[in-house]
A protein has these predicted regions:
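Phosphate/Mg2+-binding loops and adjacent switch elements
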Residues: 1-31
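Catalytic core of IPPT-family isopentenyl/dimethylallyl transferases
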Residues: 24-157
Length: 157
């Protein structure tokens, strides 16, 4: 959110317009997509831990600061997950615990939608981190990158 606002302030261009322009450019890179996933219960636990950490690191103060500087809750940028959930709290319409619970729920729902989108739209190597460790994921990745021609092998070894 802050990055998008800074970009608009510096360039006068919407961040979404910039992203659309970049998306149209042909990449000079030979790339492959590696997608990490895990069992839903483990993913949801990590989401909850991450949100708890974000709260400890000042998420509430960040949102309050934006609102205090006059950023309207109606702005698209303020409708993002992690911001919109706290507006009712600052308006006195819910408790902080209720706002955090709503943030966790919305984040879990978003993660589920992301996984669905990736499964339908993106071709690549899926690695289930619930079934392997870091070394196993690395081995799978290296094999895949070689198969895709992204990683060249030295035939002398």
């Amino acid at each position: 959110m802050t990055r998008a606002l800074e970009y608009h302030y510096l360039t006068g261009q919407r961040f979404s317009e910039h992203n659309a322009e970049q998306k149209e450019r042909e990449t000079p890179y030979n790339a492959a997509v590696i997608l990490l996933t895990m069992e839903r219960e483990a993913l949801y636990a990590r989401i909850e831990q991450r949100i708890d950490l974000m709260m400890q690191q000042g998420l509430l103060a960040e949102v309050k600061g934006l609102l205090d500087r006059g950023y309207s809750p109606k702005l698209v940028s303020m409708q993002g997950i992690g911001y919109k959930e706290f507006v009712p709290y600052f308006n006195g319409d819910c408790t902080l615990d209720e706002a955090v619970t709503q943030l966790k729920t919305n984040t879990r729902r978003f993660a589920k939608r992301q996984l669905t989108w990736f499964r339908r739209q993106i071709e690549g190597l899926w690695i289930d981190m619930s079934r392997t460790d870091g070394a196993g994921a690395l081995a799978q990745t290296m094999t895949y990158l070689k198969e895709q021609g992204v990683l060249q092998t030295n035939n002398n070894s």
